[in-house]
Amino acid sequence: MDAKLEELSFTYFPENYRWSHGLLIGLNMAPWGGAEIGEVNRVGLRLRNRVGDDDAWFREWAREARTVEDRGRERIAEGYTTSGAQYLHRASAYYHVGERFLQPKSKEGLDAYMRGVACFRDAAKYVKRPRMEHVEIPYDGTSLPAVYVHAEPANASGKVPAVVFFDGLDVTKEIQYFKGVADLVARGIACLIVDGPGNGESIRFRNLYLRPDTEHYATPVFDYLAARPEVDA
């Protein structure tokens, strides 16, 4: 990294920009419930002497994710569904941050990825606000998995605006949720977060590869939104 840039950047692992950026993805989800700084730091400390070992990165994030997931499921079983859902949200994010560096994707990695998806889905059952739905958007004879997050409060006198999020290279819809979606829905803007071709579930389990003509898969996404009665299309 350029020396001047390094002075301006928070680099948890100064010798490895990629790992520092990956850990920052974890830390940056904290304001929206996707991480707890102490938990992320605990993972970072365990990795200090193994910088660059992507298998170790995966194992330590998965270890933390499983610990947090177990606590969340225990809370839910005890009737503390709000705190349980918070744990599951963080576990979902940790599973996905840990899996992102695995190339090629292994069965172990795909299993961890799906645990993250399951944690997010299970948390949604207990989160009353913002209200969200897991939806499937018809596309090329199959569908794109997505999360629709309702505007809060709903506009009783009219329709609401909406924003679409498509994932980046190695981001998932579950991670994207913890990147400010709650702030938008609190301002009365609905959000649709999509695992498009080449991302998330679409590439891992549906063989939908990245393509350059974004309009090909964006069009059915916007058609889906336009068909929702509460959206101002």
Describe the role of every protein-language-model region.
Residues 29-42, 92-135:
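An N-terminal hydrophobic leader/cap segment in hydrolases
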Residues 160, 165-172:
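Active-site glycine-rich loops that stabilize anionic/oxyanionic intermediates
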Residues 59-70, 85, 89-98:
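Amphipathic alpha-helical repeat scaffolds of TPR domains
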Residues 1-57:
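Long, non-catalytic architectural segments outside compact domain cores
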Residues 169-182:
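The serine-hydrolase catalytic nucleophile loop
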Residues 208-233:
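Alpha/beta-hydrolase active-site loop
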Residues 59-61, 65-68, 111-158:
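N-terminal cap/lid segment of alpha/beta-hydrolase-fold proteins
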Residues 183-201:
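Conserved alpha/beta-hydrolase
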